Amino acid sequence: LLKKIERVNKMKKMYTIFILLLGVFNLSCSESKTGTYSENKTEKNIFNTIVDTISGAKFEYNVAESTPDTFNLVHLFLPESYDAQLLNDKHPENIRNYEAADIFDLLFEGLVRIDENGKIVPGLAEKWETGKDKTKWTFHLRKGLKYSDGTPIKAEDFKTALLRMLNPEIISPNTDVLFLIKNGREFYEGKVKAENVGIKILDNNETIELELTNPIGYFDMLMTKVEFSPLNQEFFGKLGEKYGKIPENILYSGPYIIKSIGKRKLLLEKNKNYWNSSNIKMNKINVYGGLWDGDDHKRIAESKGIDATVVYSQFFSRAKLKNDMKETQRLSTGSSHYYVFNTKVKVLSNPKVRKAIDAVMAGETRKEYGFVPEYISINGKNFSALAAKNGKTESESYHYKNIKELLDEGLKELGINKMPVLNIVIKENSIDRFSENLKKYLGIDVKVTRVSYKDLILKSRKKDFDIIENEILLGFSDPILYLERFVSDSPYNYGSYSNSEYDKLIKIASETKDINVKTDVLVKAENIYEKENPAAKMGYGEITHVILERPGIKGLKLVPYGGILYLRNVNKAK
């Protein structure tokens, strides 16, 4: 039976990152066992159309002169908006926003941030602490902080930003993080006033205290999002909808400001009022945005004045360049695509029922063990391999000669004689590849509801579904940031899955500093996921970025979080 399902689902294993995340084009790609996309003529023709559409065919850049204190970068994308809180609001499903987040990292800074090594480091807060119960997090601002125009940065500016993010008119996946704050969700739903939210301003506006509803040991990691950077209420109030539209209508809290915005071009200058300005080496960074393949990329990379460029390896022509620009770094990241089961729906509260549905929906992709993507490592070892070895078996459903028997067992345990119609919510541009199979192999009737990505987020938050499509865009490098989604009180636990042992393991992993302990408990948590099936994992999309740079460029680094590039340390050898 499974082989039949696998044949029906042959083309379903990987979804194409470039299209699902761009949300613009429908494109089918062939794939390899590792999840990277192979190139073919159809793929390249469609891709060239995207190139022409996004960046304009043969568009010529007037590249600025490369000087010792000027860095000229060719980037894949430029942001659609320069309003930090709206980074992922306009098109939250669009990969453009996620890949261009590294530009925002230069313009804005929050209480804490992630450095080039993936570690949480002080940002505008010089220190922070939390109590033993992990429900109160206190952040102490640095002395004398200023925005780019010299206006003091105060603790209340962070409160303004957080409350703005809790405005239901702003649809960003990262808003869910703020539901962890006491009465954060209630404020979002209009049930309480701002003064009832667990945000306190202390110490003469130099300290902010965030009170959580439940203990979260890794809350500081969640607060590294650029959307949580400060917002001056007076400045924002005067501009209203004009805020962030042009460089002059932005207050910058990061190491750079926008000097000018041109056609596919962004000119940045050092923010002299940034607290750590003396350690920022480049006075100017010129970013040229676009998307290239083959000859187009080669032509741009060879342009006089370009210091570095980042490209997708899948579409990078490896023809030797006529200059001294060389490949120096390569990094694979990716996205996870899955469907969440609403465990509050009686028929989906049983693991056997979920496992049977998962087996049919995911088909051959379900051969992967657990939830964490195959390319993720921990402690120098492949995480999925460790978890599968520890679990000793793949999904139990594959050991049944007839998956229908597994479904019937689950229904019997629930005292249900017949499967009800399931409401499956998917994105409006997604393809329904499972309704026919669910009916054919399990006798389950399905109602498919297609919605916009924003409505998908809203329905997820309201738990208005039986099964709902979800994805993690440009995934994380740490397994815990995947597995924490199924912790009972996680803001991303849309299916209300709850397992006390699982919660305990994730809590230990979030608090321990021993990598061996962390690895052990996360593997155990993955084993629980594999047994309980709170979601149907449809696979993952892996993509590899490549940096090409000229000799003498230092400090530029590919990172799997907060965009794709770490640009703060860029400098040139003298």
Model-derived features: positions:
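Structural transition elements
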Residues: T365-G410, I426-S430
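N-terminal lobe/hinge region of extracytoplasmic solute-binding protein
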Residues: V74-K132, L163, L251
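Long beta-strand-rich cores associated with HINT superfamily self-processing modules
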Residues: I547-K574
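Extracytoplasmic/peripheral linker and loop segments enriched in polar/acidic and small residues
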Residues: V51-D52, A64, E394-E396, K447-L456, ...
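Alpha-helical secondary-structure segments
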Residues: N72, K154-A161, N205-E211, P255, ...
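Gly/Pro-rich hinge or "lid" segments in bacterial periplasmic/extracellular proteins
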Residues: L212-I280, K284, D295
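Extracellular/periplasmic solute-recognition and catalytic clefts
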Residues: K259-L267, N286-K344
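Surface-exposed binding/hinge segments that line
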Residues: E129, H140, P173-E234
